[in-house]
């Protein structure tokens, strides 16, 4: 919109013409009427771009601190263990990008090529993109309103040159915010396989996961399943399991049974996970015999099977 004020929510936003920043704008009445809204041409551009990506997976969480970014990183690592599988990891946690640190890519920068932004590669078959690569320092704060965040996500989806990719893993911020709405809107025409939702066993975390599940239902986003992280601690010496965060209401298992949502698995606590993330290395390499590694591998296999079954179903619908 010409003459739009700073903080403009955009003509296609639910707050168009009604937000606080709209007061005094010459376009306020036009936006409020809905006449100024028009289909975003970026949606079609992104659909074309995503034709080279076979599967798209969102990783969500109701709360911060439940291990969502750690899971996203290790999901990407696990999928990429097959050298013939091309994997991309996109970090859209705009205000809290931790993927560069976890993947050992701090200090890397984005490079522009003739076909778009080039991802930063961990391995030949594992590329990463994050707003963290655009910051001069990892300690810099990103203080952006919704429209600017949405523009950044649009640019990531439209302008990053992933090439032919089997899996695109998208790490999102906690909760249900502008970033989630934007990525679902922009990828709607391109098809999203589904979402993996992270939680811990406590009811205070599960309460927000129920909101996340409600969000998925409202925006028609398929749910691959729930992962219960920090599910227990297995002593490396005696092999006995202790509940560090005991589930007060039955944990993720009881919630999934009540809501008829698949429980993909439970990942126990392992001190090596945090150490691996701090060093920017794969936990699977650091602790291949850990019960947490076995839990991760089982969960990743279930996600892979879900995506393959969705692809087979879609191909059957398309075939004559």
Curated annotation (Swiss-Prot):
Residues annotated to bind ATP: 62-69
Cofactor(s) listed in the protein's UniProt record: [4Fe-4S] cluster
GO molecular function, one term: ATP hydrolysis activity
Keyword Transmembrane helix annotated: no
Record PROSITE patterns: MRP
Source domain of life: Eukaryota
Cofactor note: Binds 4 [4Fe-4S] clusters per heterotetramer. Contains two stable clusters in the N-termini of NUBP1 and two labile, bridging clusters between subunits of the NUBP1-NUBP2 heterotetramer.
Example of a GO biological process term: iron-sulfur cluster assembly
SUPFAM superfamilies to which the protein is assigned, alphabetical: P-loop containing nucleoside triphosphate hydrolases (SSF52540)
Residue list for modification N-acetylmethionine: 1
One GO location term (cellular component): nucleus
Annotated keywords: 4Fe-4S, Acetylation, ATP-binding, Cell projection, Cilium, Cilium biogenesis/degradation, Cytoplasm, Cytoskeleton, Iron, Iron-sulfur, Metal-binding, Nucleotide-binding, Nucleus, Phosphoprotein
Protein residues bound to [4Fe-4S] cluster 2: 235, 238
Residues that bind [4Fe-4S] cluster 1: 8, 22, 25, 31
Localization per record: Cytoplasm; Nucleus; Cell projection; Cytoplasm, Cytoskeleton, Cilium axoneme
Function description: Component of the cytosolic iron-sulfur (Fe/S) protein assembly (CIA) machinery. Required for maturation of extramitochondrial Fe-S proteins. The NUBP1-NUBP2 heterotetramer forms a Fe-S scaffold complex, mediating the de novo assembly of an Fe-S cluster and its transfer to target apoproteins. Implicated in the regulation of centrosome duplication. Negatively regulates cilium formation and structure.
Family: Belongs to the Mrp/NBP35 ATP-binding proteins family. NUBP1/NBP35 subfamily.
Subunit details: Heterotetramer of 2 NUBP1 and 2 NUBP2 chains. Interacts with KIFC1. Interacts with the BBS/CCT complex subunit CCT1.
Listed name of the protein: Cytosolic Fe-S cluster assembly factor NUBP1
Organism of derivation: Rattus norvegicus (Rat)
Gene that encodes it: Nubp1
């Amino acid at each position: 919109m010409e003459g739009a004020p700073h903080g403009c929510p955009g003509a296609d936003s639910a707050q168009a013409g009604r937000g606080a920043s709209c007061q005094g704008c010459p376009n306020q009445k036009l936006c409020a009427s809905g006449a100024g809204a028009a289909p975003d041409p970026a949606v079609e551009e992104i659909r074309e771009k995503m034709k080279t990506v076979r599967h798209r997976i969102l990783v969500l969480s109701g709360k911060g601190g439940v291990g969502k970014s750690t899971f996203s990183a290790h999901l990407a690592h696990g999928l990429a263990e097959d050298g013939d599988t091309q994997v991309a990891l996109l970090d859209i946690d705009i205000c809290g990008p931790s993927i560069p640190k976890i993947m050992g890519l701090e200090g890397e920068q984005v490079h522009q090529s003739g076909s778009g932004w080039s991802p930063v590669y961990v391995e030949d078959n594992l590329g990463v993109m994050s707003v963290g690569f655009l910051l001069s320092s990892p300690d810099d704060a990103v203080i952006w309103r919704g429209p600017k965040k949405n523009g950044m996500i649009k640019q990531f989806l439209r302008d990053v040159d992933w090439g032919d990719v089997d899996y695109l893993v998208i790490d999102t911020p906690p909760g249900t915010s502008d970033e989630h709405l934007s990525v679902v809107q922009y990828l709607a025409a391109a098809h999203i396989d589904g979402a993996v939702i992270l939680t811990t066993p406590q009811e205070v975390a599960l309460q927000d996961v129920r909101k996340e599940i409600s969000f998925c239902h409202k925006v028609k986003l398929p749910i691959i399943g729930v992962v219960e992280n920090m599910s227990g601690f297995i002593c490396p010496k005696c092999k006995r399991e202790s509940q560090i965060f005991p589930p007060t209401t039955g944990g993720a298992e009881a919630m999934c049974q009540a809501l008829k949502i698949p429980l993909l698995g439970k990942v126990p606590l392992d001190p090596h996970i945090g150490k691996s993330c701090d060093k920017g290395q794969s936990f699977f390499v650091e602790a291949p015999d850990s019960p947490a590694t076995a839990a991760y591998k089982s969960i990743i296999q279930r996600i892979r099977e879900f995506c393959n079954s969705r692809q087979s179903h879609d191909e059957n619908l398309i075939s004559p």
